[in-house]
């Protein structure tokens, strides 16, 4: 548990069910400025391939294949750990601002962390330093190594999937520096594309890339993306996660029961049931128990009666508490199946956390990207998590939109001088 990172965290205040499909793909090579070269990773052993017709696992063969895979991944840098504490501290600083109560919310700290990391490569001066301070990064070199290690350590592609992806979409006629795209590709595995902002063509290209990277889980949100002709840059990070439980729930034991929301209202939901020996953490105001997945684990936190999830998340260091020492217990699970998705506007949250210059056309410094003025117009994140008897599927994307700063100048006010009632006038000579 010491190295656990919060990939996605959420509060289920009331059940919300939703569904969406994936859109048609678009060939993005026609827009490519710089395409990232991903590491050539070996294929992970497929758990099901080592099971016989009765579902019995050949453990010796599977463990041998898994050890071989892990050795090969370590040679490619998989064992070179990022600073997990830095990511947890960032998550602790941001979750309390995002989970304010009243509604279901899903948030990926890692997705925002990586997106802001890319933003530091495109900014300079105090604009950059404010983002670096929020990320807890000592310098640009350390942050680059951190993000690269994070990308590699998160990566999993086999019977369980966990992967990050990054992209920068630039306005096709914008005067931007090639070095910016080169840096993003080298350190962030980010591809850069030029698209005709403000057109359906650009909207489809961006939505297609996002759908491909998130398994189509957020196609409803990506289908609503509308670029603007003033957009200079649209920066994206995605995370996609899919893994089965090591000990699945049995569908035959799933029963309808009552879920009580924070406001006391009741809803019917399908609850999955299972008893297993596992870890439990008894914390101040809550009980936490992780359920193991084929890639990582999902920690469920049940607040004590009278304690809200939001109050726990607002507590300094709460997510770090969840990496503490657990004890063994027989865990009797009763978990609702759920499918929750949300979109969160992060602009005001980031400003409250000290990132202000990037949003100010007079202060923003985007000289590593362009010699013309630019500023961040909006930052948002969409996320979705589904769990059922078999396992967990989750996806998120963070979007940072930057415009030409000149395009953000407010138009002059309109003042009507309709002299249809008594009025004054004064004539001045030309020396006044």
Name each region found by the language model.
Residues 1-8:
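Bacterial N-terminal signal peptides that target proteins for export
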Residues 16-19:
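C-terminal motif of bacterial Sec signal peptides marking the signal peptidase cleavage site
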Residues 21-23:
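Bacterial signal peptide processing site
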Residues 25-85:
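N-terminal low-complexity, Pro/Thr/Ser-rich intrinsically disordered segments
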Residues 37, 42, 46-54, 102, ...:
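Non-catalytic, conformational "gating/processing" segments within enzyme and secreted inhibitor domains
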Residues 72-162:
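Post-signal peptide N-terminal segment of secreted/secretory-pathway proteins
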Residues 303-327:
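Internal alpha/beta scaffold segment
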Residues 423-432:
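C-terminal or internal capping secondary-structure element at the end of a domain, subdomain, or sheet
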